Regions:
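Extracytoplasmic/periplasmic substrate-recognition and gating elements
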Residues: 54, 79, 149, 278-344
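Conserved C-terminal helix/tail region of periplasmic/extracytoplasmic solute-binding proteins
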Residues: 147, 171, 336-339, 358, ...
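Hinge/lid segment of periplasmic solute-binding proteins
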Residues: 89-147, 193, 197, 285-290
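Glycine-centered hinge/linker elements that transmit conformational signals in sensory
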Residues: 166-167, 213-247
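Extracytoplasmic/periplasmic solute-binding protein
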Residues: 128-132, 137, 163-216, 262
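Short, well-ordered beta-strand elements
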Residues: 27-38, 57-62, 85, 128
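Short, solvent-exposed loop/beta-turn-alpha elements that line the ligand-binding surface or hinge
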Residues: 103-117, 155, 185-188, 203-229, ...
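Extracytoplasmic "Venus flytrap"/periplasmic binding protein-like
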Residues: 50-115, 144-150, 157, 263-264
């Protein structure tokens, strides 16, 4: 009997030890990054695997679908294993997630920055999120196709000249074998290009006129006719049927441009790697020009440059996971592997060890700036309840494009929707 009891005690001890060591393994520091940029998912996955291989620290990267970051973040933060690293791109995001944003003012990664101009700070001046890259967007041009159609970049200096070139190409699309614009898709993967980035144009000019630098309670929509100008040009000079834009995807638009079926493609510097890599486009055949919409003096406009790409570290994560996350970020911005990925995938970054970006669109942005052109800053960072407001604009654009509604629905969503969402956000 004593032998049996001793044996049972030994078994219990072994099981207890196993459970203890299992618990220790589960408590090892780790990093969970909820990535904002679908186009950079593969690069982040590769970098995370490399870091884990070198350090033994597990890094998990999950990428939210385009246009669904806020809802994905909300769902993930409610889980027991929440992101330790996430996106907090503007003051509205900080208002939503202030309790989750660790003070990064004295973090080693923050001290590696060359400027704090775009960092997100709270009312006390504490840095709650750091800007890890600066981007530009505009109209990407296949200059080889443009020249094949008998035109050149030098012709396009404002909306009137852009319209003339685009309409000529569209009229001869069958003969040329390509059209003017890639599809202006309004499905969830693509709509942000137009409810956010294109809608920035009327916001920017209205805010500039009125010296608005903080989120306003209301907007007038003074430049919505200009928004209509460029939207009409997009949807009426493309191979895509405007009736079907609600199901047209980001991938379809990229493929149309990347495979030589369209001359113009509204998107940003983040597409450089995909266009030259996945689609094998010749870098010499790519350029980015401003989005012209008929505003007086737009001949002096540059690209739309700014950022909403800001890292925040989860203040509610364990101290061990916070440290692991900060160590990972420091490695990303100082190591050869990390800085090379950032240069290749993200373009312009403001860290001391940053490599020169190979991204030609970043060079285009700098060329406009050097020529004295004004930057079209990212006014959309002031949008209240961003995803809800944008969904209203998308609904208006969808109905208008399909012929089941008129432009007034877009105006209502833009102006009245702004006031409604501001009130909802600010109480």
């Amino acid at each position: 009997m004593k032998k049996i009891i001793a044996l049972l005690l030994a078994v219990v001890m072994v099981l207890s030890m196993g459970a203890m060591f299992s618990g220790c393994a589960a408590d090892e520091p780790s990093v969970y990054y909820l990535n904002f940029k679908p186009e950079a998912d593969a690069a982040w996955q590769e970098l995370a695997a490399l870091y884990t291989e070198q350090t033994g620290v597990k890094v998990t990267v999950v990428t939210a679908a385009g246009g669904e970051y806020e809802s994905t973040l909300t769902a993930e933060m409610a889980k027991s294993e929440a992101p330790t690293l996430f996106q907090c791109g503007n003051q509205q995001a900080l208002a939503n997630w202030a309790d989750y944003c660790l003070d990064l003012s004295d973090a080693a990664v923050t001290k590696e920055m060359t400027t704090d101009e775009y960092n997100i700070k709270d009312a006390e001046g504490k840095t709650r999120a750091i800007a890890y890259c600066y981007e530009s967007y505009g109209i990407i041009v296949n200059t080889a196709l443009l020249e094949q159609a008998g035109h050149s970049l030098n012709e396009i200096t404002n909306f009137e000249t852009l319209k003339a070139v685009a309409e000529d190409i569209h009229a001869r699309a069958e003969e040329l074998g390509f059209d003017a614009f890639s599809p202006a898709g309004l499905d969830g993967t693509s709509a942000w290009r137009f409810s956010g980035h294109l809608a920035n144009l009327p916001m920017f000019y209205e805010f500039r006129d009125n010296n608005i630098t903080e989120q306003p309670a209301t907007v007038t929509g003074a430049y919505l006719e200009n928004y209509k100008n460029i939207w009409d040009l997009y949807i009426n000079n493309s191979s895509a049927d405007p009736v079907n834009l609600s199901t047209s995807t980001s991938d379809e638009s990229a493929a149309a441009f990347g495979t030589g079926k369209a001359v113009f493609y509204q998107n940003g510097s983040w597409e450089w790697a995909s266009l030259t890599g996945k689609y094998g486009m010749n870098p010499a055949d790519l350029a980015m020009i401003p989005i012209y919409c008929g505003v007086e003096g737009e001949e002096q406009a540059g690209l739309c440059s700014g950022t909403e790409n800001c890292w925040a570290v989860n203040a509610k994560a364990s101290e061990a996971d916070q440290k692991a996350t900060l160590d990972f970020l420091y490695w990303v911005v100082t190591s050869d592997e990390g800085t090379q990925m950032m240069a290749d995938e993200l373009g312009a970054v403001s860290f001391k060890n940053a490599k020169v970006p190979t991204n030609g669109f970043c060079a285009d942005a700098q060329e406009y700036a050097d020529a004295g052109c004004y930057n079209v800053s990212w006014a959309f960072n002031h949008t209240p309840n961003t995803e809800v407001w944008r969904s209203g604009v998308v609904s208006g654009l969808t109905a208008y494009s399909a012929g089941t509604g008129d432009w007034s629905a877009v105006e209502t969503a833009f102006v009245e929707g702004w006031a409604t969402q501001y009130a909802a956000q600010n109480g």
